[in-house]
Swiss-Prot record:
Biological process, per Gene Ontology: isoleucine biosynthetic process; L-leucine biosynthetic process; L-valine biosynthetic process
Cofactor(s) annotated in UniProt: pyridoxal 5'-phosphate
Gene from which the chain derives: ilvE
Main function: Acts on leucine, isoleucine and valine.
Full protein name: Probable branched-chain-amino-acid aminotransferase
Annotated Gene Ontology cellular component terms: cytosol
């Protein structure tokens, strides 16, 4: 996609410049391309405003710092760059992708000459592919322990396993994979956080072994404001059969019903989506004003 609805060129913000879509390229020897040394965010703009932009931007900078990357712009400058990009591309509802990466000055693992670069891209929000809900299977791949990879950094390296797991799920006829942590407890889906419901109580894994999603945090806040109890616990795979409902949360999908999870010896079906639907509606009110 290279043009917007008014047939003007799309632009991507790169290191302080608005670059036409077709010219927004990187060198073949880009360090982060070879070593996954980049961090990014996934954001949504509604009616021309990015939801929780400050929180996303602060997390972007923090993610970079965890990897030892010094972002050459402060939070306020990155926020203003978002606003400039949205105005330039004349879009209201969009998916936003900020990225911080190392340049092509060296292929050494560590080199003080490596530059740190920033881009922000915005494309129109795509129609939701799983409006009717989706079906999961349990991936054979486990999340790395927090002392192996920094889980609160939204690093490209984390997504190697996510890609592998989701591809396997798709090949087997499922929509996505449920990931377990290094001890076998439920963690998350490949790119989203997961919630379960029983007796009007929300259960969700403790977010110390995976990225604590901003949408996840928002849904917990909404649920508590509605008077719902939320329990963050270590959840075992066999507990899935005890729940009546399941849903996933994420910037791109917002709140998405999960219809079933194949746990190996059986498929657990979820038919009661009433609480998820209420949370979905309330979330929509907040993000769309």
């Amino acid at each position: 996609m290279t043009k917007n609805s008014e047939n003007n060129l799309w632009y991507i913000w790169i290191n302080g410049e608005l670059v036409p879509y077709e010219l927004a390229t990187v060198h073949a020897l880009t360090h982060s391309l070879h070593y996954s040394g980049s961090v990014f965010e996934g954001e949504r703009a509604y009616n021309g405003k990015v939801f929780k932009l400050k929180e996303h931007t602060e997390r972007l900078v923090k993610s970079a710092e965890v990897l030892g990357l010094k972002v050459p712009y402060n939070v306020e400058e990155i926020i203003k760059a978002h606003e400039l990009l949205i105005e330039k591309n004349k879009i209201q509802d969009a998916y936003i992708r900020p990225l911080v990466w190392c340049g092509s000055e060296s292929l050494n693992i560590i080199n003080p000459k490596l530059s740190t670069n920033v881009l922000i891209a915005a494309v129109p929000s795509m129609p939701r592919a799983f409006a009717a809900g989706f079906n999961l299977y349990v991936s054979r791949w486990r999340k790395a322990a927090p002392n192996m990879m920094p889980v609160q950094s939204k690093s490209a390296a984390h997504y190697n396993m996510a890609i592998t797991s989701k591809k396997e799920a798709k090949d087997l006829g499922y929509d996505d994979a449920l990931l377990l942590d290094y001890e076998g407890y439920i963690a998350e889906c490949t790119t989203t956080n997961i919630f379960f419901v029983k007796d009007n109580v929300l259960y969700t894994p403790i977010a110390d072994r995976f990225l604590d999603g901003i949408t996840r945090q928002t849904i917990i806040e909404i649920a508590k404001n509605l008077g719902l109890e939320v329990k963050e616990e270590r959840l075992k795979l066999e507990q899935i059969e005890d729940f009546i409902s399941c849903f996933a949360t994420g910037t791109a999908i917002e709140v998405q019903n999960i219809n079933s999870i194949d746990i190996g010896n059986k498929k657990v079906i979820f038919n009661d989506h009433k609480i998820a639907d209420v949370l979905k509606e309330e979330y929509g009110k907040i993000v769309r004003g």
